[in-house]
């Protein structure tokens, strides 16, 4: 059987990994310098200033939503959100009956501008959290549509490329073998 011996590392190895070690000195900040290391010495990219931010590329191209479409999408999303909250509320309640709160929200959904409505004029239609949820959902839907369009375009391009490959291969075979009949041997 093989026999092996191991030795315990000396304290010098631990000294190499300490902050005072020359191996770590290059990226460690000096006592009088700022806490972030210099990008030239440590190979990290400097963060961009707020004024120097590059604009994000437009994903939709010419497919921008009009304000009417945005409003319609927000209204649809809000009704989905309210239905979801109703279903969650109904699910959490016992099966025996429905509370007055859900009935009141149902009546406010059907007729929000009725005189008996509990919604005040000064009260905003959406809370900040609801607007955030709506925007996230709209962005997700828009991203999904863009992904679908992108996949369709890629599939079309791939099909065109395949067609040209098949045509090229067929032309090469015809040049090489001419009008001779194809055989299993060749």
Swiss-Prot record:
Keywords: Nucleus
Disordered: annotated segments: 1-64
Subcellular locations according to the entry: Nucleus
Residues that span the membrane, as ranges: none
An individual GO BP term: positive regulation of transcription by RNA polymerase II
InterPro entries: Akirin
Main location: nucleus
Segments of skewed composition (Low complexity): 49-60
Intervals of motif Nuclear localization signal: 22-27
GO cellular component entries: nucleus
UniProt motif SYVS motif: location: 183-186
Its job: Molecular adapter that acts as a bridge between proteins, and which is involved skeletal muscle development. Functions as a signal transducer for MSTN during skeletal muscle regeneration and myogenesis.
Family to which this protein belongs: Belongs to the akirin family.
PANTHER family xref list: AKIRIN-1, AKIRIN-RELATED
Name of the featured protein: Akirin-1
Organism: Xenopus tropicalis
Gene, per the UniProt record: akirin1
């Amino acid at each position: 059987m093989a026999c092996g011996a191991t030795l315990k590392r000396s304290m010098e190895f631990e000294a190499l990994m300490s902050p005072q070690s020359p191996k770590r000195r290059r990226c460690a900040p000096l006592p009088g310098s700022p806490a972030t290391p210099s990008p030239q010495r440590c190979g990290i990219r400097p963060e961009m200033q707020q004024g120097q931010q590059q604009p994000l590329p437009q994903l939709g191209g010419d497919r921008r939503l009009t304000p009417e479409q945005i409003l319609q999408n927000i209204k649809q999303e809000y009704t989905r959100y309210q239905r979801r909250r109703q279903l969650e509320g109904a699910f959490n309640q016992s099966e025996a009956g429905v509370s007055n709160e859900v009935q009141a929200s149902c009546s406010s959904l059907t007729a929000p501008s009725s005189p008996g409505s509990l919604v005040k004029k000064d009260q905003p239609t959406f809370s900040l959290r609801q607007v955030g949820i709506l925007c996230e959902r709209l962005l997700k839907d828009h991203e999904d549509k863009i992904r679908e369009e992108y996949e369709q375009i890629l599939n079309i391009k791939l099909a065109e490329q395949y067609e040209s490959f098949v045509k090229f291969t067929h032309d090469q075979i015809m040049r090489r073998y001419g009008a001779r009949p194809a055989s299993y041997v060749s």
